[in-house]
């Protein structure tokens, strides 16, 4: 054994045999590196100094002269970026609206525009012909390429209650949710005469509430319905007065079974924004908040329904983008206003779903993700992220500056409250900031920041570390406090510090450079660059698990005498540790063989290599085997006995 390495080692067989001490050579003590430098500050995400939607949601009304303009209606303001593309004939919520004068605000008389782009008086003026032409052309192309299966999905998402439709985003929990909510739909097939007859869902949308006798799930249904307060898209539609795509171009092919759903009153049937999208995203995001174990999947389902409005030929991409933006604002405002109801609904939802799935808190997450992609179309988180990004922009190129810093709306951190219960409100705001969409896309650069929020990406944790990022997880609280995964590719110059007793798994191609310190809990590497490009320092109460498919690389590695390192070796390079600089390690080293890998006696198993190796493990445990260490100045392996 090299004089560069001193081992006081216990090589244990996990079948119950008594371990035998194996002692290495003594060597002079090595100066132990210090933790990565403390940046001395934490990141922040202040709200813009503008009237906040959550403080003004009650102004999202039509038929009230007090709330009929851009300045006085919060819903209209959320999507005011549309005014750079299209100027309505009148800047009032007045399409088909009459309202008396009130409190000094002038009476509202109905707009005289026809709602038809080719019939005077038209409802507005095109200011950006390139973007608006692309907006409608997208629908032409989509509807002409539409498959029969897509047409069927678009029909159901149009005619069914949105609260019912989006519940299939629950995956393996869908049946339990619908049973508990007592949800029903009367539209289980597309009738043969649907091309001439308008069918209306006579089901109950979100289900049966507490007042109707649903003791097990009524609070959940009540809360979902409560989230629709002040959520109407009609004020926005009647302000912007922008036509549906099939009125702009006859080349748009509405799903034949939805032709009877076309409104014969174009003057009051604006396309911008999509009401179906706004309601679906609001319902889906609320359900995601109540069951964060399916958070990303539920938000993805809401966005899918929005895209199906384009597939149907009923809406354009900008209509759907605007609907998503209003949904985020309304959900934030109502979660804030009805927070106590939300917490009660959260508790009831879990109790009911645990009972109906015969699970416990410790097994519920696994059950919620037990179905393969063939049975759960939202099972692939990578695909969810890609689809969300596509559905946020629908192929539009930026038309404004690309590098404006993100702004997080006031109160928006509540959207992630149950998804990241171990993060502070400020930290959740920073998560939203660091995962936001780049600036410059049509209508999405609103003053508050609703348009750029990428909620699907935010559900995967930070996108960037700036300054100190201290995460404290209490495993005793269960759920995400006990174990969580961050999948984003994290950049920045900040430092990550893990505290507490929970397990945090990092799986992105991370580039953060400020280093990583594990003061408590378990930090797991699920990718080769999980720990960024800085130093990794493990304190006496800390534990690191290397469980990536390829060797994990760090700049330097230090572990104190009571620390623990686990290597999950798969025989294909996974589970190994590569340190570009010095490795100074104490504590316990646990080696496991995973994914069916079963080495044989006599095999030499590489574990780690470093620029320089100074390992002082108090014991090495090789699960299922007896072994002895084989080391050099830069490498450590074990030979199975």
Regions found by a protein language model. Give the residues of each.
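Extracellular repeat-rich scaffold modules on cell surfaces
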Residues: 463-533
